Structures are given as structure tokens and as C-alpha cells.
């Protein structure tokens, strides 16, 4: 077959295959056009998941008659000069969207330019353009797309259900609305109730309002403002506290010069910034806005313009990590503390508790110490100190003499310890309510931060064992541990081979005290087996520190004296990131006096 020039309609349909993948792609292109036209209000309507009908109405500048006639021709655009391809400042620039849509659907455009006496309308069907006719429209542009892919029916079978396609449209509009909080958006359709986002004032407060309207009130409560700048590149936005997480990274949004993009860059940078706060299977919610010179970013690397390429991707990644780490550190405990939400409070409502039993005596309850018992009997396997008469089995009212809160302690952020319950949780009184602390999770974070600080300064202090502890493990585990012996040694854990299937532990970190060496080594080996070989040394060392901290912290079941509980609270207040343990769980929750009064019907 000889080489021949393809007809314009076929060329446009080929281009449409790249630009118009699904109804959401049409909405994206048309809303971007509206934003580029200076619209202050945009209305989006869809029917049948967008395949039957899509309508976009805006109050932008509109088009003249001459511009409208050219707009549906391929590569006709008002947004790009001859030499501006590397300095793109608009969302659209190729001039492909309208001709591509018109080649696979029925397209109708009605527009009125501010200098025109009336509006003009133009229809395109299957790539065939009809003559322009006068029309009625007060301002801006209205674009309607119907029977999407009627000219390429094979594409229809690749579309999903109407509900799924409608949700994809919703996500596109949500992203564009987050990018432009100064523009009002309305989204409606046969598949959904109308949703509106009012325009807000520029600045951080307005941006947070728009993000909260879209991401929910929970995001507003936990949002931390972040910002970092260097060499003309600015990263700013809002990140959710570590207490607000998702099972996937779909709640992470990146915008570059006002353009919503998807980039693996953000996933790795966010993971690095939140590494000390979240478990590996949880992801934070955030929206980051990168602003830079258009020459520093290439937006022309993907047909749908959903990806960009930075001239200095390493700089952008470093700024994202720095902005997030700085914000999380600056917010400290506020970003980490978990509060009691309404659902939890509802569980306390009268009627949930079982009725009291007649003739019940707390002395016969399982928690009351039996004569002759001691701390070791109550919590086997844990080394205890002298309890100095501190009876954990007694009701909390009977220990108030030991834990009476001094006025100065109540005014501290975590208050004054009142008692310990279930040998696991510390209850502290604050000026505005109470705090419940998970003693193991809290102490785990403290030990972890001490290990990191020691590693960063003069190295972790070691404790030489008079008699090396021999730990028997399977040969594969032994080999794995010995391969990482140098990394373990940097944290004060010195091990040597002790024949087949065994290692000798000669030194342990002084911070760990009497931690079970065998259990520690087994856990370390399990975690090492999950490591990616490409994982940086720093991250591997932090994983080691986190595992060691877990084994070196106060366990649930350990009875604490009042002075020990208060000392733990004070150390938490002075330690960064103490609101989460190393696995991302909260170390304490707050219950305000207002919450307590609600429980008893006082409010």
C-alpha cells in the first residue's frame, strides 16, 4: 500500500485517542479552557457518566466570531506564541482539545466576547463543522458534548459504568477546584446531587477553606500549613496530621504552577517525610502547591498534560521533604495528638453501660491483689522495681494521695498524672480536661528519639555484657543478621557468629536496659527481610532504631509509681514527635471538659 496523507477527520480521531480517553478527559480539557479564559464561575453538568451529555458553562471572556471559527481547527490556539513552548503559563496550549472532541462526539459551542454585540454558536459533528449562527448568551462560553464516542463506537466498550465515570468526572473537578480556590465551581448531573464550592479570597486561609470543603472537616481540624523555598522554587500547602491517614496515596494532591498533576516524586518524598510518624501501610492526606519559573518545568511530556518534568527534580523533592518535616516538627504534639471524636463519645452515652451488680465488692474483683502476690505474679515476664506500696488493684480514688496534681503540673500540656489503669494507661488531669496516655507507645517514641539523637551526636552508648548472650536462630536468619552486623553495631548492638544457627550478643544499647535479646534479634531479622535493597542506609538505620525502641520501652503491664508517670509526661512534652509511637499509633488522646460534660448531659 502506498504512503498517503490521512484525511483531517482521521488525524483528529487519532489525536482524540490520546487526549480524550474517557468523559472525565473531556471535562478536564473544557474546564481548563474556562479557567484560561478568566472565568470566575464554572458550572459542570454530566448525564450518563458523561457519555450521553456534558455541559460546561463559564463567565469568562468568551471568543469573537473569528476566534470561534478557528478554535475547532487542529493546533489553533490563542495561548502559545512561537517560542513559548518551554515557558507555558496556561493550562491548555496545544489547540487539540476542541477538534479532538468534535471528531468523536457531537460538539456545540456558544460564546459571547465582551466586545461582540451578541453571542455566536457553532456545531461540530463527527469532525464536520457547521456554519456559525447568532445565539443568545449573556456572557462567557457554554460548551455541550453529546453522544461521546458515537463516531468511534469501539471506544465505548472500554468505558466503565455510569457511576464510575461520573466519579471520575467528580475527581477531575475536585482537583481543578483545589487548584483554583478563587473560582466558584458547581458540579451537577443525573447521577448526583449538585455540589457547589464558593469562591474564596486568595491566600492560605482561603486555600484551606477550599481544601476543607473538598477533603472534609476532618482535614481542616488536622491541617498543618507547610512551606519551603529555595532557588526560586516554592513548595507550600497543607498536610494532614499523622492522625489522619488513608490506606492508599489517593489523598495526596500535587499542583505545579496551578496545574493538577500526578507524579511519583510526591509519593517518595511524602513517605520520607512521614517515615517517623506512620506505619508503612498508611498514607497521609495533603495538598502541595509548587510554584516555579515556567522554564524550570516541562508540561509538554504527556498528551493529557497530567505529568510534568522538572529541570531539577532533586531540588523539588528536597523542598517537599523539608516543608513537611518542618511543619510536622513545628506543630509538635498538636499535630500528633488524637482527640475523642463524636462516634467515640456516643459510645459513652447513658444506656451503654450494664447495670451495676448487687453486692459487688471490688476486693473480690480479679484486679485486686491476692494476698502474697507481687508485681511479678501480676505481669509475668517483666522486670519490676519496688512498688513502694503503690497498689494497682485499688480503685483510683484510693491513690489520690499519691498522685494529687499540683497546680503547676495541671497547667502543663499533658497535665498531672492521677492514676494508672489496667497497668497500661496513664490518666492525667489538665486544666481543660484529661489525657489518657498509652505508656508503652509513649515510652517507645522517647527511646526512639534518644537513639536517633545519640546516633547523630557521639554514637549510641553501649553496655558490655559480662557473659555474652547466645541466641539460637535458623541459619538463614543468622546469615541475614551477620550481613547487617555493622549497621546493628552503629546502634550499640554487637553480635558475632557462634557456630551454625547461633549468634553471640556481646554488647547492647544502654538505653534498652534488660531487653530480651533473642526477641529483639528475631524482630530485627523479620524487618530486614522486608527491606528493599535500594533502601538508603539512613532509612535502614532508622528501622533498626525503631525496632530497638519497641523492645527497650516500658511494656503494658508494668506498674508505674506516680513520680514515674509524671516523669514520663514531662519527657513527652520535651520530646519531638511524641504524639505517635514508631508504628504510627497515637500515644495519647485528649478528652476536654466540654466532652466530659456532654457525657453527663450538662451540655
Curated annotation (Swiss-Prot):
Species assigned in the record: Rhodopseudomonas palustris (strain BisA53)
Gene designation per UniProt: mutL
Molecular function via GO: ATP binding; ATP hydrolysis activity; ATP-dependent DNA damage sensor activity; mismatched DNA binding
Transmembrane segments: none
Keyword Transport: no
Keywords (A to Z) from UniProt: DNA damage, DNA repair
Pfam families xrefs: DNA_mis_repair, HATPase_c_3, MutL_C
Designated name of the protein: DNA mismatch repair protein MutL
Function: This protein is involved in the repair of mismatches in DNA. It is required for dam-dependent methyl-directed DNA mismatch repair. May act as a 'molecular matchmaker', a protein that promotes the formation of a stable complex between two or more DNA-binding proteins in an ATP-dependent manner without itself being part of a final effector complex.
InterPro entries (alphabetical): DNA_mismatch_repair_CS, DNA_mismatch_repair_MutL, DNA_mismatch_S5_2-like, HATPase_C_sf, MutL/Mlh/PMS, MutL/Mlh/Pms-like, MutL_C, MutL_C_dimsub
GO BP annotation list: mismatch repair
Amino acid at each position: 500500500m502506498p504512503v498517503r496523507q490521512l484525511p483531517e477527520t482521521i488525524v483528529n480521531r487519532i489525536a482524540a485517542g490520546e487526549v480524550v480517553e474517557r468523559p472525565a478527559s473531556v471535562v478536564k480539557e473544557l474546564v481548563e479552557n474556562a479557567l484560561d479564559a478568566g472565568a470566575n464561575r464554572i458550572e459542570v453538568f454530566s448525564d450518563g457518566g458523561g457519555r450521553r451529555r456534558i455541559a460546561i458553562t463559564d463567565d469568562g471572556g468568551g471568543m469573537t466570531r473569528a476566534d470561534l471559527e478557528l478554535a475547532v481547527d487542529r493546533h489553533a490556539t490563542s495561548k502559545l506564541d512561537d517560542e513559548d513552548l518551554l515557558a507555558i503559563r496556561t493550562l491548555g496550549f496545544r489547540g487539540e482539545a476542541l477538534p479532538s472532541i468534535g471528531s468523536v462526539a457531537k460538539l456545540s459551542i456558544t460564546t459571547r466576547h465582551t466586545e461582540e454585540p451578541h453571542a455566536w454558536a457553532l456545531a461540530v459533528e463527527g469532525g464536520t463543522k457547521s456554519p456559525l449562527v447568532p445565539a443568545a448568551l449573556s456572557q462567557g462560553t457554554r460548551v455541550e458534548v453529546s453522544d461521546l464516542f458515537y463516531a468511534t463506537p469501539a471506544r465505548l466498550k472500554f468505558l466503565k459504568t455510569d457511576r464510575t465515570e461520573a466519579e471520575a468526572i467528580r475527581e477531575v473537578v475536585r482537583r481543578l477546584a483545589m487548584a483554583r480556590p478563587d473560582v466558584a465551581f458547581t458540579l451537577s448531573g443525573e447521577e448526583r446531587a449538585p455540589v457547589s464550592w464558593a469562591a474564596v479570597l486568595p491566600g492560605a486561609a482561603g486555600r484551606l477553606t477550599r481544601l476543607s470543603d473538598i477533603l472534609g472537616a476532618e482535614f481542616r481540624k488536622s491541617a498543618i500549613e507547610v512551606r519551603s523555598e529555595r532557588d526560586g522554587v516554592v513548595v507550600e500547602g497543607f498536610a494532614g496530621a499523622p492522625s489522619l491517614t488513608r490506606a492508599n496515596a489517593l489523598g495526596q494532591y500535587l499542583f505545579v504552577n496551578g496545574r493538577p498533576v500526578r507524579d511519583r516524586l510526591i509519593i517518595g518524598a511524602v513517605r520520607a517525610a512521614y517515615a517517623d510518624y506512620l506505619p508503612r501501610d498508611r498514607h497521609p492526606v495533603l495538598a502541595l502547591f509548587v510554584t516555579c519559573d515556567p522554564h524550570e518545568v516541562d508540561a509538554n511530556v504527556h498528551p493529557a498534560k497530567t505529568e510534568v518534568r522538572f529541570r531539577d527534580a532533586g531540588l523539588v523533592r528536597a523542598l517537599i521533604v523539608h516543608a513537611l518535616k518542618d511543619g510536622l516538627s513545628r506543630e509538635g504534639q498538636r499535630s500528633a495528638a488524637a482527640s475523642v471524636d463524636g462516634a467515640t463519645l456516643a459510645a459513652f452515652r447513658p444506656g451503654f453501660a450494664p447495670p451495676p451488680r448487687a453486692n459487688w465488692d471490688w476486693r473480690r474483683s480479679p484486679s485486686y491483689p491476692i494476698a502474697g502476690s507481687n508485681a511479678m505474679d501480676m505481669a509475668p515476664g517483666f522486670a519490676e522495681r519496688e512498688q513502694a506500696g503503690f497498689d494497682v488493684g485499688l480503685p483510683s480514688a484510693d491513690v489520690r494521695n499519691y498522685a494529687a496534681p499540683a497546680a503547676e503540673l495541671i497547667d502543663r500540656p499533658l497535665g498531672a498524672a492521677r492514676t494508672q489503669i489496667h497497668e497500661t494507661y496513664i490518666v492525667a488531669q489538665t486544666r481543660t480536661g484529661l489525657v489518657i496516655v498509652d505508656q508503652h507507645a509513649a515510652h517507645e517514641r522517647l527511646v526512639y528519639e534518644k537513639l536517633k539523637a545519640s546516633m547523630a551526636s557521639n554514637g549510641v552508648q553501649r553496655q558490655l555484657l559480662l557473659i555474652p548472650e547466645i541466641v539460637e536462630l535458623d541459619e538463614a536468619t543468622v546469615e541475614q543478621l551477620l550481613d547487617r552486623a555493622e549497621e546493628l553495631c552503629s546502634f550499640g548492638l554487637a553480635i558475632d557468629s557462634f557456630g551454625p544457627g547461633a549468634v553471640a550478643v556481646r554488647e547492647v544499647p544502654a538505653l534498652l536496659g534488660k531487653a530480651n535479646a533473642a526477641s529483639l534479634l528475631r524482630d530485627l531479622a523479620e524487618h530486614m527481610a522486608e527491606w528493599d535493597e535500594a533502601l538508603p542506609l539512613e532509612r535502614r538505620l532508622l528501622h533498626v532504631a525503631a525496632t530497638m525502641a519497641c523492645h527497650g520501652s516500658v511494656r503494658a503491664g508494668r506498674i508505674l509509681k506516680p513520680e514515674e508517670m509524671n516523669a514520663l509526661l514531662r519527657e513527652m512534652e520535651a520530646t519531638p514527635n511524641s504524639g505517635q509511637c514508631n508504628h504510627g499509633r497515637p500515644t495519647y488522646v485528649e478528652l476536654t471538659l466540654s466532652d466530659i460534660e456532654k457525657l453527663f448531659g450538662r451540655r
